[in-house]
Amino acid sequence: MPKDVSPSHFAKEENSLSQALAIKHRVCIQNQPPTRCLSNCAPGTAVVQAKREKYSRKNNPAVILMEKVIAAKKASNLRQHDYYSVEKYDKLSFALSDITPKVFEEGTFKAMPFLKEHVETSPETGKLILPLSVDETVSQEIYRKKQNEKKSIVKGQRTTGMNELIDTGDILASMLQDVFTEVNIYEDDIRFVQSQFLSPIASNGAISFYRYFIEDTTYVDGNKCIQVSFGPNNSRDFGFTGSLYIMADSTFRIAKADISIPIKSTVNYVKRINIAQQFTQLPSGEQVLAKNDMFVLLEAAKFLKTLEVKRYTEYTNYSFSPLSDRLFRFRGNTKIEPDAMMQEDKFWAQHRTEQLTKSEDQTSLFVKRIMNIPGIKPFIWVGKSLIENYVPTSIDEEHPSKIDIGPVNTMITTNPVDGLRFRASAQTTANFNPHFFWRGYLAYGIRDHRWKGMGEMTYSFKKKAYLPMEFPTANLTFSYSYDVGVPSDQYLNTDKDNVFRALTWSSVKHMMYDRSFKLIFDREWEDGLQWKTQLRHSQTEPTYHLFYQPVSHAYQSEPGQPYSITPWGPGSGKNIANLNRNFLTITDLSMTLKYQPGVAYINTKQRRILVNKEAPIYRISHTVGLKGLASDYTYNLTEIGVRKRVWLHSWGRMDFDFAAGAQWNKVPFPLLIMPKANLSYVYEDDMYNLVNNMEFFNDRYAQLMFNWNLHGKIFNRIPLINRLKIREHIGVNVLWGRLTDKNNPDLEQNRNRDDIFVFPGEFQNGTFKPTGYAMNPRIPYVEASFGIHNIFKLVHVDYVRRFTYIDDPAITRWGIRFMVRVIF
């Protein structure tokens, strides 16, 4: 062993390699604090005393060795071949951990004596566990070099256990698969626990990010190997730790890897991760992954039970034979064979490379026994309602829910026009009809005494499992709605009358009733392409402090005086009813094209959750106003946009969202372009935090929204604060806007026009004070946010500051926004 490198320095400095326990190759750690044993311990194993030294990369044999390993990676790149295919078996299991015999004798489990038949001992922890769900997938991965195309064909898919209790059944498995993705160290960047980790053998950056130590020589499958331990420079950064077993020959191939994360890692809810990887050499010389055995121990809080997640993946039958073009003839990256979910036991016996345990094989029986417990169904019904935000009308497996009531968080809320607002909502499910769907709501405001509502009928050309929004869509929808709101409501990711949105930082005084009919065709393809066409007829009615007064009807300064315009209001002596327009009626046709390669969603009852946020999103839309077709105006609105996420390894991630657009015709202010104003204290992604309702009006705009989550890169280096595991967030929103002369009501050239309206404002003691303006094209709107995220692993708090357009005393220059979000 080289004398200039302390083999135990890394353990002393990190105290984290004790977590690098191979799943089937247990590592022994000696009781003496400053000592360790990294290899598989056996009688006579040497124990090395830790000695603290300064780490140096210069002339470091471990670093020199790793540079050779990294350089040799190219020889194992399967994409050098014209074709390749491989069979893949994947098993994902989820279990309740740390079960003790005592729990069966008291409390809730006392009424479930059958649970004793379903528990088993975890080989990783030695404790009793209760398997809750098992998901298995058999697939074939195929690749062709000419088109640089890699795809997956799913031949078998099987789900048992707790997933059967969730109506959108794939949500649990999809979330676990998205969080605990496959780890392949031969890839430079590894997406894991919804973040990006740098591989210890990444071509760029690994040598500077990790520290390496030569530990020992050992044998793996009869091959002499050099064991190298590794870990990040800062144990709180998002990085791996563990050991690599490198072939002691000129190929520098990796035979085995034991991977974990540091004890001090700021990854949330993860108490322990162990990943054991085995590699094999193909006859053609490439070193490829053969088995990936992952074990994760989750802990949400100290007072709660821990959970075990296991993911076992095995690759077999590597082949470089030519593949038929027919195999690649499907859109998207994944194709599920029609009979994949109907495979019989014979298929699984043939393709299952790791047998299920007795308890794993009985997870369906376990769920049935749970459901047969007297009095249990009301508790399950309440639990499902709280988790899914919808109340199912049945939880009987033989008669599943055909109608779900909800969302629950919209039943009671408030706004300035409605006052206290009550809403009843419901939607049908695929159990009613897998092609025809209905959803709607009825609401009533105590203050305005008006009934509002929405009804929507959808026909899905594709058979759905539960809801029509499941990806990919091919839906024809007709809807009618009558409700009150503000223009920014259309940009929200949640329902506009979500009870939490009632907490507004700005006094909302300009609202409108909107009665609209929509006919929508929405088509998505597996490769990420989306086409949406909408025909809309809408009639808006201003309410509260909002009014539609044509410029020609407003008071204007006398000839010879500087031009100014002021609307007539209460106390003016004018008949306001004759001056103001009661309604604005439009009919328009819009077309939207969006492309997001590699798109993937998790389905919930309320919305789809985008999981592959690394892929860019390109979008373009155009809307045409159809005057004469029950419409007051002709107009053309064009918008484009692109969104991209960039990972910076240990420095976190940056999100960029750019958009631009133009309203080409003469239109009143309700048809101009207004910023996406978030009026709530609850933080919303991709919205302006300090722009007031209807504050800016543009017919040309460009905007950039930037967010940088640093993953604790700075806080992790501050003593004491680093123990809190909080993370930094920086955001900047910039809006450039311009209003052309033809749409500016404040210009004298428009004084006689009745097709544009005076901008919104309010009357104070008979004096009109405008609250909406045209932006100065030389001065962009700029706001920034500085946040502390991951407080108690849930709460995000941001300080937001506005830097331009701050001369008006009524403007709010700064504020605090918050949100609750579960992240790893």
Spans of model-derived segments:
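Short aromatic loop motif centered on NTY/YTY
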Residues: 261-262, 267-312
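Hydrophobic lipid-interacting interfaces of membrane-associated proteins
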Residues: 91-94, 233, 262-264, 280, ...
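Extended lipid/amphipathic-ligand handling interfaces
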Residues: 215, 242-248, 274-284
